[in-house]
């Protein structure tokens, strides 16, 4: 049964979508079968993989509303072994529409049960908020990756997110783990970047991925061409960073499987 990983941080601009798309694509290149669920009404993962959100007829909205099964809305991407459940602007209405429903936090988990055996890993790209859609993602997930940019105020809001994760563990999903904190947008020339790395590693030590995602022009360009970095420029630093992250992620998860 595939492992489900949410990628979450209520701060915007920290590299959530970049990580969701490129970690998923890198695992696909490493011959893992991967599904990416776009659970952000901005639909950035959807457009970053070459789909126009305005033309998406079926996606995460219909899955959360249980109007369609997950398998009915899955689309193939041009990346090896990577499928997508796309998002469209309608997703913004889900927060209001689910509010009065029973088990409203469980909708995504229940929907993904159907496809969990079809994939090695399922990633959920969360919105930059702690609303009902993100709550659904955390309830559906086995673990969560938290991207943190190497910039001023990097740790701002992290305490709030960790408290939300704790309350999800207490109420909805006792098995939710923190997969790791991922440092993004690192620039070795900047003293501040190096200070943030030091501070995060001091505070969170073993929770932090060894792989650090560097600032990279090619990585920033790739989404505007509707491509993952691995398809856009496999030799770039950005592609190599995410391949290294994928290998680190696999090493950790395969060790856990062997010890289980």
Describe each region flagged by the PLM.
Residues 1-260:
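P-loop NTP-binding core
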């Amino acid at each position: 049964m595939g492992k489900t990983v949410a990628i979450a941080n209520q701060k915007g601009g920290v590299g959530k979508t970049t990580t969701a798309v490129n970690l998923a694509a890198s695992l696909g290149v490493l011959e893992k079968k991967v599904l990416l669920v776009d659970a952000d009404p901005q639909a950035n993962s959807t457009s970053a993989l070459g789909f126009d959100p305005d033309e998406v007829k079926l996606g995460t909205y219909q899955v959360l509303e249980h109007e369609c099964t997950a398998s009915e809305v899955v689309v193939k991407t041009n990346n090896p072994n990577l499928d997508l459940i796309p998002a469209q602007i309608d997703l913004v209405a889900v927060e209001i529409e689910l509010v009065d429903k029973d088990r409203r936090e469980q909708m995504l988990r229940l929907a993904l049960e159907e496809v969990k055996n079809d994939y090695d890993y399922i990633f959920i790209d969360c919105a930059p908020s702690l609303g009902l859609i993100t709550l659904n993602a955390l309830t559906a997930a086995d673990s969560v990756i938290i991207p943190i940019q190497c910039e001023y105020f990097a740790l701002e809001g992290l305490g709030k997110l960790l408290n939300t994760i704790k309350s999800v563990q207490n109420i909805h999903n006792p098995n939710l783990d923190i997969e790791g904190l991922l440092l993004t947008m690192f620039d070795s020339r900047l003293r501040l970047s190096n200070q943030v790395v030091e501070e995060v590693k001091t505070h969170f030590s073993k929770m932090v991925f060894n792989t650090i995602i560097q600032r990279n022009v090619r990585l920033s360009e790739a989404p505007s061409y509707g491509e993952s970095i691995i398809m856009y420029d496999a030799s770039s630093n950005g592609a190599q960073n995410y391949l290294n992250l994928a290998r680190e992620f696999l090493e950790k998860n395969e060790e856990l499987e062997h010890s289980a």
